[in-house]
């Protein structure tokens, strides 16, 4: 049964789920169709560049990323520990369901990492004059790999105008158990 989360809510992933080891972090978004390209763009077939959202998993120690190697994204698809794997880049966000997926083997996450922050940024957001105000239906969900069951889902529904990147949520270790925190925090940092 899926737990529908609101911003700031947390859910335990491993307590009471004996045997869970791998989860899929599924992320999705759609580009808003209105206003893109303007009147002349509609008349003459010209439009701005597609919005390319990119998901990343940042492995943190005491809440901080220690090394660039600890960022798993389209340019570094697998963490050196083998615990986190990015399943590839979706350049348009088109289609139903997850646009990008990150697989996390909770049992292989080295002890020095206490959280895995899941962020999504817009590729070349500043140069393309794009922000998360142009995105709709954004979500993050956690799926149990054993049976492909959705454990929890967080729909990001706030207005994120002017934000170039978003912290969707985080997996974190607390007292030996893994939990998920629905964050939904935007930032104007285009380099995140």
Task: Locate predicted features.
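Intrinsic-disorder/low-complexity signal
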Residues: 1-115, 119-192
């Amino acid at each position: 049964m899926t737990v529908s989360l609101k911003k700031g809510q947390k859910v335990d992933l491993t307590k009471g789920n004996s045997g869970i080891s791998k989860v899929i972090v599924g992320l999705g978004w759609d580009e808003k169709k209105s206003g893109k390209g303007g009147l002349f763009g509609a008349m003459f077939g010209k439009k701005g560049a597609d919005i390319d959202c990119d998901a990343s998993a940042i492995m943190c120690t005491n809440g901080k990323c220690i090394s660039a190697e600890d960022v798993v994204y389209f340019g570094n698809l697998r963490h050196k520990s083998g615990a986190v794997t990015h399943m590839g880049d979706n350049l348009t966000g088109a289609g139903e369901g997850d646009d990008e997926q990150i697989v996390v083997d909770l049992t292989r996450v080295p002890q020095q990492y206490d959280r895995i922050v899941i962020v999504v940024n817009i590729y070349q957001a500043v140069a393309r004059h794009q922000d998360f105000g142009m995105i709709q239906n954004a979500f993050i969900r956690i799926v149990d790999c054993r049976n492909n069951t959705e454990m929890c889902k967080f729909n990001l529904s706030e207005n994120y105008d002017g934000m170039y990147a978003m912290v969707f949520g985080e997996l974190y270790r607390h007292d030996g158990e893994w939990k998920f925190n629905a964050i939904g925090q935007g930032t104007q940092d285009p380099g995140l």
